[in-house]
Amino acid sequence: STVDRYNDDIHYKNGTHLSAQLSWAGTMLAYQSRTPDIDLVGDQWKDMWLERLEGQPFFMEEWLAHQRRDDFWKHGSICEDFGGFPVPALVIAGWADGYRNTPLKAIEGLGDKGKAIVGPWIHKYPHFAWPKPRMDFHAEAIAWWKRWLDDADNGAEQLPQMRAYILDGPRPTLRRENDPGYWIAKKDWEKPQTQMLTVAADGTLNATGASEGTGDIYLRSPLDTGTSGGEWFTLKPDAEIAGDQRSDNGGSLTFQTGPLAEEAIYLGAPELTVDVTCEGDWENLAVRIIDVHPDGTETRACYGVLNLAHRDGNETPTNMPRGEKTCITMQLDAMGYRFAPGHRIKLALSTSYWPTILPSPQAPGLTIDTASIRLALPLLGDHERITVAEPENPNPLPQYEMRSPEETRRSVEKDLVTGLTHYRIYEDTGLEVHPQNGLRTQEIRNEDWSIDPNDPLSMKGDIDWNIRIERDGWSVSTKTTTTMRCTNKDWIIAASVTAFEGDREIFAKSFEQRIPRDFM
């Protein structure tokens, strides 16, 4: 869920263009193309399907027509008027999910009407989500609804305003099954006190107040910087979660503390202030806060991105004043994280975070005044340790019979002949049989993002889906394609839907549109 459809949803983030927007548009194009089940609707299935196919939209056309915060996004954003939202709300999210900011923003806006829970999870319900530990979501939800829908006297209104799982140095792995950490509660949520980190003359990140810095540094990250960032929208605890950050640091400007003498625990949204100079109209800035383990392994604790044309707000973006030093303040995503003694805190700045965000059309880079860097980290403050009940059933999902195996592939390829970097995703659900109704389905997604590290206009995104649905004596399928290209002035998007009854094509439709870039 989100309280802010523009900044905390799958489309845009602080004025940057999320690649997840095209991915989700391609996903929805494929999902909408699926046929009705012949066993449920009978002989009218084909007429219903053709009507559905004829009428289905390509959502990217509408989303890309609203690149700034306008009424289209305000309409579904309760942050526009929290006072007009009278309903008590229990808001739940996970640190590994793109919607991690929602619980904190909700309780800050709703006050006593809001309660928040943030676990370690991806974008799944907490009773079957990864990474573990899980939470008994059913018990939490039922108690909440009984209190507010059935007037049950169960004390739900007395719940702590914030319950959060503090991540305790999880290591990047091929699959994040379990994240170390512990649950805390804060009875009342207040704006956290902060610890201020600055850059010393020797380049170290420190909390002493010394901010001599190392001078002005020009930063223009290779445009393929960011391939260890995982997905904005996480559905699996594998490479969709950010991996070891060292591979992205080569294209970044980094500063780190010495080994910590004592633990440092944070809960909330960090804030970075920095003076930058831009020789172009605008540029993107990505910021990562990293936990450096004693052996050098690096875990991303949180990150944030900003299109500098949106530095003063998302409704009326403006060009940067060329050649003039400009003070930028940006809020990063929320985190709940413990840096252990002996670990280091690293700050990484880059002008690219691909493929998570798409590059600006000029990609001019930025000159960073390192003496101006101020990183405000939100301290955990007063709290109590708590336990959170886990679900009684550790494996609640139905078990599907597999007629063909599932497969996932994800890779980064640097082509030394063309100079392109490819980020490729292949997912095949396998042919599975629904345990209750016997419907057989298979979904295959093939996604390819590519870019020349020196040319922002070389960016391409290609997404293909193949969906197969069958019963004995009945087989239908759809193939969808979704693409994005760009010029200095336009986004170029295209899509197609083709439907088959057996091997025979019975429907085809295509979309293509050129949409002007709007400070993006």
What are these regions (language model features)?
Residues T2-G84:
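Accessory cap/linker subdomain of secreted extracellular hydrolases
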Residues W95-Y99:
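Acidic catalytic loop of the alpha/beta-hydrolase fold
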Residues N101-K115:
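Active-site-adjacent alpha-helix of alpha/beta-hydrolase-fold enzymes
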Residues G111-Y125:
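Catalytic histidine neighborhood in serine/cysteine hydrolases
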Residues P131-F500, R504-M520:
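C-terminal, loop-rich substrate-recognition/catalytic regions characterized by aromatic stacking residues
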